[in-house]
Amino acid sequence: MRTRLSAATKPVDETQARVRRKEQTRQNLMQAALTLVGNGSSFTALGIREITREAGVVPTAFYRHFKTTDELGLALVEDGGITLRRLLREARQASLPGEDMIRHSVSVFVTYLKQHHLEWRFISSERSGGSQSLRNAIRNEIAHFTNEMASDLRLLNIFPGLST
């Protein structure tokens, strides 16, 4: 017996597939920029054609995801910051004694750096160079990270008197 998809189900499946493809293209563009930076290119010198060629998409596809290369860079900073802060927050909430929690957090951080070395190469080079908007975004991510860590350490009373 053959099951027929209702007319309402088919467009939903197609829409979901389109959303997945769009997200995959966005990720490919971001990874392409990181790969090019990892190969020695300066992010600020990267062109849209160069990024899209590396990503395997046509140049017009870039504009469906980002208005400028700066916007792409901001997405890289944001994604990296959100992921790292989440991982470190989970590490700090692992109910470990103070010093063990710090060691675990450092271990998580080092593992993340090793697994995401291209992101960190990008962030470290753009932190002092590149565009003002990227420098500001990186500075904000560092401030978020520092504030979250200081707040958790204060709550654990590991460093009494630590201001947050």
PLM feature segments, named:
Residues N28, L36-E71, A75:
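Helix-turn-helix
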Residues A45-L46, R121-S125, G161-L162:
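Short, hydrophobic secondary-structure boundary micro-motifs
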Residues M1-Q24, N157-S163:
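N-terminal intrinsically disordered/low-complexity leader segments
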Residues I82, Q132-F159:
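Amphipathic alpha-helical packing segments from all-alpha helical-bundle domains
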Residues R21-A33, I51, L76-L84:
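Generic hydrophobic, amphipathic alpha-helix propensity
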